[in-house]
Amino acid sequence: MAKRQIVDAHHHLWDLDHGYAYPWLQDNPDADGMLGRLTSITKTYLPADYLADAADYQVVKSVHIEAVPSDPIKETRWLTSLGANIPTAIVGFAALDTPDVEKTLAAHAALPKVRGVRQIVNWHKNPAVTFTQSDLLADNAWQAGYALLKKYNLSFDAQLYAGQMDEMYALARRHPETLVILNHTGMPIDRDPDSLKLWRDGMQKLASADNVVAKISGLGMVEHGWTTDSIRPFVLGTIDAFGSERTMFGSNFPVDRLYGTFGALYRAFETIVADFTPVEQDRLFRANAERWYRI
């Protein structure tokens, strides 16, 4: 049987052997934090390593998402220098709340594979799971940086929690010319009934903005012991909100390698959407990532 062709909408690479620094990954990998112990992924991860993990599938193109580097332009230039088709597109890091952010945006935009930027904005009242000390979406300086994305034709990869979806919706509506790509299935970390309703309602609201699309990825980060059945409602809930035309699958490797193999993850995706039409499946696994990341 021929391998399914996929475009991975979300993965990472890093070279820890040649001076590229990722403090979140390297400083204390044995700590049992939100993501679990990082020891097994605290090593260089290059295109060949990624393709070995993805060997059950034919990865025809891929999108590299910034991995919170200490030097964002150095990371993007390194990725560009790899020269291969993996990655095909790059989403770089930009701290939108800093005074010199426009220099960063201009430097990213000058590189041919760059399509957008990401700055993780997950804010949560629980200090064990928050990624930021305050809600950046409500910060005036951050919003001013976001407003510059149109000038450089850059999309924004939005990694946030359900409690921030109303804010992201308002921002997307204020800047309809900027494409927002929701990361990691909206990160449904809280599983009590009220929180699940907040996630469902937030996904529907975000989807009502035409310039917002979604990636189904990163579910292992919020449920380390995931199963096909446990992630099913989040996969189908995302597709129900955004439709098969505005949803795409991503691996989040090697981070989600902490919680399972690439093959297990994609087989779970295939099982969950087995009743979808071939056209719908191709959108989810391949065509939508090509469309929204312009590859």
Where does each model-flagged region fall?
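Generic structural signal for well-ordered alpha-helices
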Residues: 47-51, 76-80, 101-106, 142-146, ...
